[in-house]
């Protein structure tokens, strides 16, 4: 199976952040990773691959080297995408004989694209098993819902950018009739439990659209959730393919980037530093050696970037702008929305050059602020040189996004080279990698 088809399978099988984390963990355990639990003491073995999960939606994987290591080579991406979260009181009666699902927006999505297309629901539920509470993933794997738009005959402004009210216009149709509790019954059946054992839910809408390849020569890929599952996939593949050198490789997949990252499983948490400190302790590093290891560390923050739009090139900076299929994008911002500086940009560019991977550069147009990402958030907790990168795409945060088919291979190749390096500083302050 080639890289694009493997990516498509990962995208199609990861309708929510919970499924994305579960599929990433499954790939790691298939490669021999030993699962650790934060609530237990760790005993680390040399040469062993490990994975630890938090909140069913974030994970950190690492491989303990056979010998001493200088520091940590880290990469981070995120498992979530803009969508709609189903409320705990899920059913909402509406005009006529229809029953709608009560939802609210999650993140900053382009919501109009969600209208008039088949949708469904997936996520995690908490259930009672005897005297235990356990989480279980669910996916209603069929065309279940639709958010109907208003006919042009009733709203002549529909093609003029009419504003959508999420409390009025964006509630999906669930069914006909007023049968109370029908949705809860459906979820309990999907979880394989009796209704009284279904205690709580975290469910999200997802489009039923599958990932596809388009273009005269298959140059493009079109799929939901490319931001940021394309980077999750590329970093994961590179992490698994690498042959570690003198640094300890670490892969972090965070959740909740689309809503600010300030959750216990987000980049603005202690998750990564908690894991690194426990690695240091398990490898016998004292406080002084731990600080030296951090000083000899590096991070790649991987979150997709904006390509120049064929219909609106004016939104791009007039200098250098990324194109689909043109390679990995290094992102820069004077106000530190991206963490790339001269040092981190040079390190990653040099690695890509040696790996034969093309590099592009991106800066927001000076009068368009753009968004922030994982790098500047995580470095507030762990002060290491960090480069913000991504793969170029169009229609970011739309229900379906477009990217270049060749770029995923570039990311896998670059991350394989990156995780195989030995990054540290010499006695003169120079960087050895």
Regions from the PLM with identified roles:
Residues 1-433:
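N-terminal hydrophobic/helix-forming segments and targeting peptides
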């Amino acid at each position: 199976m080639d890289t694009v088809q493997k990516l498509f399978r990962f995208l199609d099988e990861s309708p929510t952040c919970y499924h994305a984390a579960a599929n990433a963990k499954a790939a790691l355990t298939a490669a021999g990773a030993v699962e650790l639990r934060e609530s237990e003491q760790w005993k680390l073995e040399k040469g062993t691959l490990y994975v630890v999960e938090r909140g069913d939606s974030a994970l950190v994987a690492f491989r303990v080297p056979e010998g001493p290591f200088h520091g940590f080579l880290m990469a981070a991406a995120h498992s979530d995408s803009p969508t709609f979260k189903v409320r705990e009181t899920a059913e909402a009666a509406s005009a006529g004989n229809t029953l709608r699902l009560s939802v609210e927006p999650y993140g900053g999505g382009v919501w109009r694209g969600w209208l008039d297309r088949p949708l469904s629901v997936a996520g995690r539920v908490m259930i009672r098993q005897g005297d235990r509470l356990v989480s279980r993933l669910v996916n209603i794997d069929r065309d279940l819902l639709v958010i109907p738009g208003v006919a042009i005959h009733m709203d002549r402004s529909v093609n003029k950018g009419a504003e959508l009210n999420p409390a009025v216009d964006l509630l999906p149709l669930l069914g006909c009739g007023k049968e109370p509790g029908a949705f809860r019954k459906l979820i309990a059946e999907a979880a394989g439990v009796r209704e009284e054992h279904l205690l709580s839910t975290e469910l999200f809408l997802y489009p039923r659209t599958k990932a596809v390849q388009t273009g005269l020569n298959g140059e493009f890929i079109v799929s939901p959730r490319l931001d940021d599952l394309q980077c999750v996939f590329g970093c994961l593949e590179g992490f698994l393919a690498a042959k570690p050198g003198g640094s300890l490789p670490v892969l972090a997949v965070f959740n909740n980037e689309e809503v600010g990252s300030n959750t216990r499983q987000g980049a603005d948490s202690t998750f990564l530093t908690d894991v690194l400190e426990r690695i240091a302790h398990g490898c016998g590093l004292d406080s002084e050696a731990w600080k030296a290891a951090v000083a000899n560390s590096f991070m790649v923050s991987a979150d997709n970037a904006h390509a120049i739009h064929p219909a609106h090139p004016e939104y791009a900076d007039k200098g250098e702008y990324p194109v689909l299929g043109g390679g990995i994008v290094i992102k820069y911002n004077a106000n530190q929305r991206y963490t790339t500086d001269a040092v981190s940009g040079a390190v990653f560019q040099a690695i890509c050059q040696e790996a034969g991977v093309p590099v592009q550069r991106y800066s927001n147009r000076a009068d368009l602020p753009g968004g922030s990402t994982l790098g500047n958030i995580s470095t507030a907790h762990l002060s290491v040189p960090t480069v913000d990168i991504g793969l170029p795409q169009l229609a970011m945060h739309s229900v379906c996004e477009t990217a270049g088919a060749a770029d995923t291979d570039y990311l896998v190749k670059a991350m394989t080279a990156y995780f195989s390096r030995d990054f540290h500083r010499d006695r003169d302050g120079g960087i050895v990698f």
